[in-house]
Amino acid sequence: MAQAKEVRGPGPRMGGPHPKVENPGKLLKRIMDEVFRHYLPHCILVLVCIVVSALANVQASLFLKTLMDDYIVPMTQQQDPDFAPLAAALLRVGIIYVIGILAAWGNARIMVNVTQGTLRNLRTQLFTHMESLPIKYFDQHPHGDIMSVYTNDVDTLRQMLSQSIPQLVSSAITIVSVFFSMCMLSWQLTIVTMLMVALMMFCSKKITQQSGKYFIQQQRDLGKLNGYIEEMMEGQKVVKVFTHEQKALDGFRQLNDQLKDSANKANSFANIMMPVNAQLGNISYAVCALAGAAMAVSGMGGTTLGTVVAFLSLNKSFNMPISQVSMQANSVIMALAGAERIFKMMDEPSETDEGYVTLVNARYDHDDNLVETPERTGLWAWKHPHHDGTTTYHKLAGDITFTDVDFGYVPEKTVLHGINLYGRPGQKIAFVGSTGAGKTTITNLINRFYDIQDGKIRYDGINIHKIKKADLRRSLGIVLQDTHLFTGTVMENIRYGRLDATDEECIAAARLANADSFIKRLPEGYNTMLTGDGANLSQGQRQLLAIARAAVADPPVLILDEATSSIDTRTEALVQRGMDGLMYGRTSFVIAHRLSTVRNADCIVVLEQGRIIERGSHDELIAKKGKYYQLYTGNLAEN
C-alpha cells in the first residue's frame, strides 16, 4: 500500500493548495442566499426576537439608574421607607427580563429549524449534483475527501448558522443600542470604554489572522485523513496478505499527526481569544468604575451613583458582544473554509449531454412500420427527430462501429490511436493485451464515461454523441471490473438492473446467470439482506449477482470488463454457461482473461500501447504466431 506521503490529498477544487479562503464575502452571501431562499419569514422573525432581546437587556441596565437614584438612595434617607413603589418597579423590570428570555428562546428555537433545514437542502443539492458529475471526477478525487465535504464541511456550517450568525447580529444590535445608551448616561465614560474596546479589537484581529489560516489547513488535513482511512478500509485484505499492518499504521499516524498539529495551531490561537478579551473587559470595567466614582464624588457632569451603576452594567453588556464577535469570527472563518469546498464541488461542471436521439418501446403497425408504444414490448427503437419536424424510428440492433478513434484521459497524452473495429449484432468481440493496452478504455468510450477526441463511434449507424447518454447506457448491459452490491436484499440488487422488473423476471435473470442455485441456499433466499458491498458473499457469488443484474436489463449490447478474472475454475464454468446464454443474440464486448472466453469469440482484438496490432478468430491468430500466440502460449495458457 502507499505510504502516507503518497496518499492523494485534496486538489485545488477540494480545498487543496489554496492558502486562504477566496472571496469570503461572496461565500457568506451565497450561504445567506441559500438560507433566505427557503426561510426568509423565519429569519425576519429571528431578527425581531434578537432586537427584542437586545433592547430588553439594555432597558434592564438603564433601569439600574432609576432604581438607585429614585428608589434606593431616597429610601436610605427615610426612617420608614415605603417599599410598594420599589416592588412595582421591580415587577416592571422583571417583566422586561421575561420578555427578553422568551425572545432569546424563540430565536434559538427558530434558528435550529432554519439551520437543519438549510443543511438538509445543501446535502440534497450536493448529492443531486454529485449524481450529475462525470465519471472522471470520481476517478480524480479521493472518495474519502468527497465524503469529508458531506460530513465535516457541512457540519461546520451548522454552528455558524445556528450560533455564530445570530450571535453576530445580536452583538451588532446590542453594541449599537448600548453605545447610544452609554452616550446618554456619560460621554466621558463612553470615551474611556471605547479606548479599551479599540485595544480589544486590535488583539482579536491579530489572533483571528493567525487562527484563520490554520483552520483552513485543519480542514485540508481532515480530508486527507478521511481519504487514507477509506483507502485502507477498501484495501484491508491486501494489507493483511502482504502483512503491511504496521506500514498502514505508520501512514495513518503521519496524517493523524498532521491533523493534530494543524488543529492545535488553529485552536491554540482561537482559545486564547476569550481569556484575553475577558481580561481586557475586566480592565475596562475597573477603569470605568474608578473614573465613574471620581466623577460621582466630584459631581462632574451631573454624574450620580445611579449613573455609575447603570454605566458599569452597560459596560459589561458592551464588552461581552465585542468578545463574542471575536470568538464567533473563528467559527465563521472555519465555516467559510468548509463552504468553499462545498460550493466548489457544487460548481463542478455537470456531465454534458448534447444528445437528442432517445430509446423507446416500439412495435410494428399493420403496415409493418415501426412505431412508438408506451407498453413494454421487448422491441426497442431509436427515436430520431429531424430538423424538418419529422421523426424516424430505427430498430435497436446492437451494431457498434469505431472509426479512426483517438482518445486520451488528458489532452496531451493519447492512449488510444486510430482504433477501427466493429461489432455486428450477435457477435462476441474479445479484447486481449497486456495491462494498460487500452482494453477498459475502449469499453469506457462505448458507454460515454469519457468522450473521444477524434474519430467516430456509431451505434446502429447513429453517432453516439447524438444519443442521449441515459438512453445509450440503458441499452447496454455492463458487468464492471469491480463488482459493487448495494445494501438491500438479493432481489433488490438484481432488480437494480431494471427497476420495474417483476420478481419472476429477476429470478429468471438469476437462473440465466446460474446464480439461482446459490441464492436458494442463502438463509432467506432472494430476501437475504446484503450489507457492506455484499461482504457475506464470495467473490464468485458477487459476480454472478452482477451478471444477473445485467441480464434482467435484457440489453442488446453487453460489456464485460474482466467479469471472470477473479473466480475459481468451478465457478467460472457456472458463470461461463450463464454468460453464453446471456450473450446469445447480443453484441458482446469482453475484456478476456480466460481461455474459454477467448476461444469461442467471433473476433479477437489484440491491443498493444493503445493500438490494434492483430485481429481475427482464435485459429487465425494462432496461425499468425504473433502477439496473440505469445499471450496464448504464455499468460492466457497459465490462466
Model-derived features with residue positions:
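Membrane-integrated ABC transporters
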Residues: 1-57, 72-93, 107-111, 115, ...
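Short intracellular "coupling" helices and adjacent cytoplasmic loop segments at the cytosolic face
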Residues: 12-19, 116, 124-148, 152-154, ...
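Juxtamembrane helix-loop junctions of ABC transporter transmembrane domains
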Residues: 17-25, 48-49, 56-72, 96-143, ...
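An intracellular "coupling" helix at the cytosolic face of ABC transporter transmembrane type-1 domains
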Residues: 37-40, 135-136, 154-161, 165, ...
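Transmembrane helices of ABC transporter permease
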Residues: 38, 42-55, 96, 102, ...
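Hydrophobic alpha-helical transmembrane bundles that constitute the permease/transmembrane domains
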Residues: 51-59, 94-105, 157-160, 164-176, ...
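Helix-loop-helix
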Residues: 74, 181-195, 265, 269-340, ...
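ABC-type nucleotide-binding domain
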Residues: 79, 362-639
